[in-house]
Amino acid sequence: MLDIKFVRENPEAVKENIRKKFQNAKLPLVDEAIALDTERRQAIADGEALKAERNKLSKANGPLFGKLKKCTDEAEKAAIQAEIDANNAAVKADAERMAQLETKKEQAEAALNKIMLVIPQMIDSSVPIGPDDSCNVEVQRFGEPKTPDFEVPYHTDIMERFDGIDMDAAGRVSGSGFYYLLGDIARLHEAVLAYARDFMIGKGFTYCIPPFMIHGNVVEGVMSQTDMDAMMYKIEGEDLYLIGTSEHSMIGKFIDQIIPEDKLPQTLTSYSPCFRKEKGAHGIEERGVYRIHQFEKQEMIVVCKPEDSKKWYEQMWQYSVELFRSLDIPVRQLECCSGDLADLKCKSCDIEAWSPRQQKYFEVCSCSNLGDAQARRLKIRYKDADGKMQLCHTLNNTVVAPPRMLIAFLENNLQADGSVLVPEVLRPYMGGKERLVPLH
């Protein structure tokens, strides 16, 4: 969400940013926002002028009442009373006009706020320009992609060899997009989460278990209406939504807060279940656990001063690379182009893991710098050294989402005999096991 003052002073830059995001249908919104802002500011100015006039008239009656009390001439008394009555009538008229202006201001503000929620955040100058994810740019690779000399089965087929998944039972219980994990596969799922938690704690992040449901105003503060409609499950009859990622409730922790400058940055890592309506949204890898309604995830967020957000962005995606490489999974960094950026993001990259079965990379993490977009909506602020109130910047990144992580892990650590190697860093979380042996 942009500052209306910035939009007012830089309309062409805002329009150019919209063009770079290939959202030309939103171009008229810039002029509409400026017109509503002008209307709002005029209503405020007119209201202030009327308030001053009203105060002036009210004060003028004081001396008149004094004169009236002392006056003995009936004609003069009548004239004074007439002046007092005229002032009172003007005060009443001003009050009615002020109420009308207040209504006009509130209506303009409501319409303006609705538009401002739709105008996208200014993207960083380094973001590649393109209409969709086909224009995302590979930045660098980490680790050598593997090409096994044996056929790598589909991930659910690998899991079934360990009696590790039951999607049929989940379908009977919950419908499509759900699963039961069992045995060593379930242990592996939990081991990855526990390792990711300790990995981030080791990087200085504070571990957090957040609320799994949040109010609508928090949802509106952390994401666009389009993303909200596509992702979030609402609790019927309640002002509560199931979180699609713990980033939402972790960022929401700071709503309407003034954080002491010496307490920045705030660095949190959290575990949570995540709930999303997105099953089938992208038409890729729909079988199995790649795209599902419910999964668990370890997330990281940073709330910092504006001058520090670019540094944190670089650090955060590198944490993801380091974690995946410690699990013997080759990855690459993919810079998201302008058309692939959600409206609140000014810069984002995906970390993609190598799939030996498909012989291509697929997304496992997404790191984003949202600038002051979320902070402006949620009023997350700090006081600088001069005592001036400033908006914080917010960032988020997936540490690990085990459903997709499991796909990458199983494919990259699968052996020709059907067993799966357990990387050294995971063995303490797997009871010391060095290898998972299939049951059939």
List where the protein language model places each region.
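N-terminal alpha-helical targeting/anchoring segments
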Residues: M1-P145, E160, G164
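TRNA-recognition modules of translation machinery and tRNA-sensing kinases, especially anticodon-binding
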Residues: L27, R141-H440
